[in-house]
Amino acid sequence: MTLHSSIDRVTDRIRERSRNTRDSYLKKIARAAEDGPRRAHLSCGNQAHAYAAMDDKDDMATTRKPNIGIVTAYNDMLSAHQPYERFPDLIRRAGHAAGATVQVAGGVPAMCDGVTQGRPGMELSLFSRDVIALAAGVALSHDCFDSALYLGVCDKIVPGLVIAAATFGHVPAVFIPAGPMPSGLPNDEKSKVRQQFAAGEVGRDALMAAEMASYHSPGTCTFYGTANSNQMLMEFMGLHLPGSSFVNPNTPLREALTVAGVERAAAITRLGNDYLPAGDVLDEKAFVNGIVGLMATGGSTNLVMHLPAMARAAGVLLDIEDFHDISESVPLMARVYPNGLADVNHFHAAGGLGYMIGQLLEAGLMHQDVKTINGTGMDGYTAEPRLDGERIRWEAGSTDTLNDRILRPVSDPFARTGGLKQLDGNLGRGVIKISAVAEERHVIEAKARIFSDQEQVKTAFRAGEFTEDTIVVVRFQGPRANGMPELHSLTPTLAVLQDRGLKVALVTDGRMSGASGKVPAAIHISPEASTGGPLARVRDGDLIRLDATMGTIDCLAEDFDTRKPVAFDPASSSEGMGREMFAAFRAVAGPATEGAGVVV
């Protein structure tokens, strides 16, 4: 199928924009790879230190068996990462069977936004991505590994690991998922209880019972937020094995897929005939495919910020216009909560990513001719994994959706576009996701209420101060102000106001993830207020027009452009809960439109 003209045009634009940086990157990883397998160049003393604790130290010192390094984000506080506790032993056995040796190269931190929502710790969340990249870099700096396995699932973890994999782009990389937890209390019922609690209609006991019934076992949360968007992304970009993203933890199929991933990691090293450095996988076509998947599934807006940072590590320069243009061409094919009632388990059962990839390829909406760890182009990702004894056999996936209330073909989508819009105006540049927003709320013109943090919004709500249509402006939430925390805890409050018949919207230089749903939210506004950006000039009562249809965001006050910006006071977010240690990160973080990066 001929590539869609818009996808072709955006890819060419990215390629041209990235010509110099990508060329420099490819030369860098070629230099790193040219002297062959890494550990052969270590001195005997260096090697003895590296192998001292290993049972197979003789193999490591005297043979040419590939040595696989594991970079793991295991902890048992994150339900999505708890299954990784068992993975190193399984990977060692699989590696030995495949003629390789295996070492845990190092661990990286992994924090849960679901735990830190609305708390001071959330101000460390975005920067944890860069810490993860740095920690993975330290793990790989021993220069002992012929390929690397990356164990990570959730919000900042996968982007941080991809940044590291790209930086060590001469080392082949395989990402190993852990899978979503089985379905619990339906997400829409959980959301309803949250809104009832916010409105004072139920007590904390009912809220706690609903939350525990929803988040109830090992595995990723089942709504389609950033964590599950990450898993989709790794499959669409060819870093997972086909059909592996949404298989539940602790099942025979999950274990067999992990074994198969180890076998691929052993097969694609420079020691064999199928050398596949990570940097060759992570090209402009792979990133375009990732954006296509984000739009077709209605994925998290956090990836609009993470993908530019990930791409930059591989010498590829993305802009939010790329997301906008791809969104305009790629239809919304899935309804997964918060865009629908289904969860990721239902999506997977309906045909999942394999069906979707097949449809997009047939329509020319994604690149087929890419390098993947599967050893094929993207057509190999239309297959489904099946157990054949204890091993994996891939067979042709369904060419028909198995539930058209959850998953639809390109020819009959839920919406013509992916629902992500670029916003531009005198308030700056940002994005809005409208796939779950009712059409009558795509344009809102209302007076502004100005807040400097989300707790102020909740206090005003409890005081009954919202009695008319309102644009809620929460500023000083950018990366240089306070680390750009997730503002998802505002969702129940704003949803209650909307359900009362008010037109409300959020405008912020902070984040509001893809789990946020039906309230219009203009997010990632840049330049951010703390650097003198336009949001710092907005006043209470100003008329603001948010027009997702035209892609504009403007303050209509006549004197707006001549006002002096309000100064940012960092006192409330400069210390406590480790925030003082991240002052250096806040000082140098890039703009959200470029990924809010520190190390890239």
Please provide the spans of the model-predicted regions.
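Acidic/charged coordination and interface sites in well-structured regions
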Residues: 86
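Contiguous domain-boundary segments centered on the initiation and propagation of an alpha-helix
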Residues: 129-136, 141-148, 458-466, 471
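A short, small-residue-rich loop immediately preceding and capping a beta-strand
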Residues: 140-161, 172-176
